[in-house]
Amino acid sequence: MCIRDRPRMISGAHQGRLLSIISKIISPTKILEIGTFTGYSTLCLSEGLTKGGRIHTVDINEELYDFQRKYFKKSPFNDNIIQHLGNALEVIPTMDNNFDLIFLDADKNNYPEYLDVLISKLKIGGVLLSDNVLWDGKVLNPISEKDISTKAIVKYNKLLSQREDMDTVILPIRDGLTTVSYTHLRAHETRLN
């Protein structure tokens, strides 16, 4: 796969800066990224890590592993980046960390399946960011029966909007970035009583 043939798969400069700012605000100890691609967003997210923090990045494309590693090694975050190669839906359940920040930018067809798996790894008060949730505006128009990706993103957006344990907003940046704060409503109610 040629990288220049996949422009929508890479976070642009503005989105990269936003990811960095969000990460710096949160000051996470543990970040999980689903969908590494070139590693650009990995490096942007790493800018906010606390000292000794770690970012786990998962990608299924083994052809890009060495490409990513080359740039990670040149960065000041090399020791903080842990690469995982494989199907994210199989890799994530093997992780036992409660993540402060999760960034989802992977296979759109599986966005709905990722939701519960990712929430189980997100600590209360953690933030879930999801890329491409406007999907070039297709989520706002009638959807072709054959358009599986758009259907999946619409379903994902609906699932997020129906959850009472999350505060959700879609930012109209590039192709849409959902920002979710996992409040775990029941935990807050228990603390108030």
What are these regions (language model features)?
Residues 13-182, 186:
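S-adenosylmethionine/decaboxylated-SAM
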